[in-house]
């Protein structure tokens, strides 16, 4: 399938820092509108940390608008549904079916894909669209000046070498949760959640218990959860174990948090109260590597002149809504769309465009960050709160769950509009009521 090129941004020079999913998506979306895009990634190669990620219909529609669906579907997997199960007894408490009704309601499908496969597709197509991508280069600073923005770069491999200052029209900082550019706006640090993740992939066909898996399954329980779904057309089984580290909590209380909180010894202890099926799965994970889960506080301002923070640099979320990658892709499409619209109208002013993008994106992304934290609380409650949570999920299963997902999945970054229940811009009232009721039971 050929990519959908246009030329509204021809002659516009843009620098992107960060070669993850958001940065590569930004390079692609802007190059497809004719912009002269250069991306700098500090690492020696384009590489994503982790294994699988989930793309809801809000991401599907963007990939479709970029002409990538054929490649994405071949590389990924289309699950039949998402099942929430109680981690203590494996009871299914909610099934979200990705059937024809779902597809018609949201105008898209639900897909899971290996992070490296998605990044490779974005990088390959960004270069095919004309973007220039470079590894081993760090963007160190920027300054808005008359007629543009100066961007300082240097070698990230041989520090202090190959220093240059480039003058371009706009600078987009997709430089991740440990963003260099964020420091120009606020002196803060990532917020540790006290939770840690272990991941692993294996051959699905060789797993007798899981070889017929066609779903995304999330086991949720007191202070833990465990995720399973197929990848690469059903070739791989992706599994993720996430639990709250007692060593982190004890260290925080004592004022001395150990660097290795969440180690494998804690992993085994954390699931003692879970169904034996889950406990037996822990040995299949990559036990030599674990990820301490952090997010960022929502920012009040993402922009300085012609520089805009985007992706995890601006709004790193926790993983519970499975929307971090899609949020970054939404950012990318918003910049390209708003700039192309302004250019088509003959009034392209990059400071105004980036301010408009921020005004559109910041409330939504802050909401996803905030609701993501609550969603994690809801997954991990214990005691009476767990029983209430389970009944709430059962009721959603019986009464229809679209109303709880429309605010997230109904957003279409390629059309500046929600396609389903646009009035649900805030966290639905029912979710707020659940939160208060559940947390009172702790």
From Swiss-Prot:
The keyword Nucleotidyltransferase does not apply. Keywords: Aromatic hydrocarbons catabolism, FAD, Flavoprotein, Monooxygenase, NAD, Oxidoreductase. InterPro entries: FAD-bd, FAD-dep_Monooxygenase_BioMet, FAD/NAD-bd_sf. One of its GO terms (molecular function) is FAD binding. Disruption phenotype: Cells lacking this gene show an altered growth with 3-hydroxybenzoate as sole source, but growth with gentisate and other aromatic substrates (benzoate, 4-hydroxybenzoate, and protocatechuate) is the same as that of wild-type. It catalyses: 3-hydroxybenzoate + NADH + O2 + H(+) = 2,5-dihydroxybenzoate + NAD(+) + H2O. Activity is reduced by the addition of 0.1 mM of various metal ions, including Ca(2+) (16%), Mn(2+) (20%), K(+) (30%), Zn(2+) (64%) and Cu(2+) (83%). However, the addition of 0.1 mM Mg(2+) enhances activity by 16%. GO terms for biological process: catabolic process. Optimum pH is 7.5. Gene3D superfamilies: FAD/NAD(P)-binding domain. Belongs to the 3-hydroxybenzoate 6-hydroxylase family. Homotrimer. This is 3-hydroxybenzoate 6-hydroxylase. The lineage of its organism: Bacteria, Bacillati, Actinomycetota, Actinomycetes, Mycobacteriales.
């Amino acid at each position: 399938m050929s990519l959908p090129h246009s030329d509204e941004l021809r002659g516009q020079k843009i620098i992107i820092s960060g070669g993850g999913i958001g940065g590569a998506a930004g390079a692609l979306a802007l190059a497809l509108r004719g912009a002269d895009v250069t991306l700098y990634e500090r690492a020696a190669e384009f590489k994503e940390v982790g294994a699988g990620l989930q793309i809801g219909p809000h991401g599907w529609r963007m990939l479709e608008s970029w002409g990538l669906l054929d490649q994405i579907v071949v590389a990924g997997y289309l699950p039949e549904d998402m099942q929430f199960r109680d981690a203590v007894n494996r009871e299914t408490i909610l099934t979200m079916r990705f059937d024809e009704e779902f597809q018609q309601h949201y105008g898209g499908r639900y897909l899971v894909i290996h992070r490296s496969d998605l990044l490779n597709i974005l990088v390959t197509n960004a270069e095919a669209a004309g973007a220039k991508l470079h590894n081993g280069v760090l963007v160190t600073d920027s300054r808005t000046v008359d007629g543009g923005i100066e961007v300082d770069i240097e070698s990230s491999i041989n520090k202090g070498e190959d220093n240059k200052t480039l003058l371009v029209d706009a600078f987009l900082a997709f430089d991740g949760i440990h963003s260099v550019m964020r420091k120009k706006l606020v002196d803060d640090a990532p917020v540790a959640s006290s939770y840690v993740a272990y991941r692993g992939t294996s051959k699905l066909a060789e797993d007798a218990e899981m070889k017929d898996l066609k779903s995304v399954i999330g086991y949720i329980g007191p202070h833990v959860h465990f995720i399973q779904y197929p990848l690469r057309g059903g070739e791989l089984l992706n599994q993720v174990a996430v639990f709250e580290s007692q060593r982190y909590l004890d260290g925080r209380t004592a004022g001395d948090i150990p660097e290795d909180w969440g180690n494998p010894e804690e992993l085994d202890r954390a699931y003692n109260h879970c169904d034996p099926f889950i406990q037996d799965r822990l040995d299949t994970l990559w036990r030599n590597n674990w990820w301490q889960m952090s997010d960022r506080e929502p920012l009040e301002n993402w922009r300085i002149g012609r520089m805009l923070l985007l992706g995890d640099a601006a709004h790193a979320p926790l993983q519970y809504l499975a929307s971090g990658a899609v949020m970054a892709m939404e950012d990318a499409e918003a910049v390209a769309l708003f700039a192309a619209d302004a250019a088509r109208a003959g009034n392209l002013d990059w400071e105004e465009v980036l301010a408009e993008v921020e005004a559109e994106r910041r409330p939504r992304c802050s909401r996803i960050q905030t609701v993501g934290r609550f969603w994690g609380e809801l997954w991990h409650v214990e005691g009476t709160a767990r029983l209430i949570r389970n009944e709430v999920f059962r009721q959603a299963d019986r009464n229809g769950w679209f109303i709880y997902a429309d605010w997230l999945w109904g957003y279409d970054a390629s059309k500046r509009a929600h396609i389903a229940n646009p009035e649900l811009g805030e966290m639905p009232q029912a979710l707020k009521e659940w939160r208060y009721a559940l947390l009172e039971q702790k």
